[in-house]
C-alpha cells in the first residue's frame, strides 16, 4: 500500500539530491518496480531513512511529481501569459512545452509509465499533477484553432507526441532508432509540431 500524505510536507523533508535521484529511478523503472531499498541504495542512505524521515516510497514519489509538475507549470507560464490566439501563439506555447520535456525527460517518462497502469495506488494523480497544464494549453489553443478542430484532442495529440518522442525518439526507414538528443531529429520533430499547429489554426 502506498504511503499517503501531502507531498509538499514530505518534499520539505527530502533533500533535493534525493528527489533528483528518485525522479530518475521512477522514470527509468516506473513506480511499481522501485522499492524503498532501491531508492536508499541509489542515494547512499539507509532504507530506514527513506521509510522514516522521507515518509517512504509513496511520499517520495508524490514529492517528485509535485516538484516536477510545479516546475512545468512555472516554465509554461511566460508563454501562457503572452499567448496570442493565432498559429504563432500556438507554436510558441508548444515549443515551450517541448523544451521543458526535453530538458526534464523524467516527467514525460513517469507519465508514460502511468499510462501503462503504473502507480495505481494513487487514483488522483491526473487531476493533481497531470492535467492542469493540459487543460491550460487546451483552453488557450482553443482560441486559435479552427472551429472544426477539437481543442482537447488536439492538445492531447501534442502531449502524446512530445512524451513519446522524449522517451523513445523515432525509428527511421533504416530501422535505426534516433533519440531525442539527436539535434537533427529534434529539429525535424519540432518542425512537424509547428506544421500541425499552423494547419489546425483558424488564422
Could you tell me what each predicted segment is?
Residues 63, 77-107, 145-158:
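Hydrophobic alpha-helical connector segments
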Residues 2-3, 134-143, 147-148, 161-203:
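C-terminal peripheral helix-coil segments that are non-catalytic and often amphipathic
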Residues 13-17, 21, 25-59, 63:
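Helix-turn-helix
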Residues 67, 110-114, 157, 161:
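Short acidic/histidine-centered micro-motifs embedded in hydrophobic/aromatic stretches
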Amino acid at each position: 500500500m502506498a504511503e499517503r500524505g501531502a507531498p509538499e510536507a514530505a518534499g520539505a523533508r527530502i533533500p533535493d539530491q534525493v528527489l533528483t535521484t528518485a525522479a530518475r529511478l521512477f522514470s527509468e523503472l516506473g513506480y511499481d518496480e522501485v522499492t524503498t531499498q532501491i531508492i536508499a541504495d541509489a542515494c547512499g542512505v539507509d532504507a530506514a531513512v527513506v521509510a522514516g524521515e522521507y515518509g517512504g516510497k509513496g511520499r517520495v514519489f508524490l514529492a517528485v511529481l509535485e516538484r516536477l509538475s510545479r516546475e512545468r507549470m512555472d516554465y509554461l507560464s511566460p508563454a501562457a501569459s503572452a499567448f496570442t490566439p493565432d498559429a504563432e501563439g500556438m507554436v510558441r506555447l508548444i515549443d515551450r512545452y517541448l523544451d521543458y520535456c526535453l530538458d526534464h525527460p523524467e516527467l514525460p517518462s513517469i507519465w508514460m509509465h502511468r499510462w501503462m497502469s503504473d502507480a495505481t495506488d494513487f487514483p488522483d494523480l491526473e487531476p493533481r499533477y497531470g492535467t492542469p497544464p493540459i487543460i491550460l494549453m487546451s483552453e488557450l489553443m482553443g482560441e486559435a484553432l479552427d472551429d472544426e478542430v477539437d481543442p482537447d484532442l488536439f492538445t492531447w495529440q501534442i502531449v502524446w507526441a512530445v512524451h513519446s518522442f522524449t522517451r523513445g525518439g523515432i525509428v527511421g526507414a533504416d530501422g535505426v532508432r534516433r533519440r531525442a538528443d539527436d539535434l537533427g531529429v529534434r529539429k525535424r520533430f519540432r518542425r512537424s509540431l509547428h506544421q500541425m499547429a499552423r494547419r489546425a489554426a483558424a488564422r
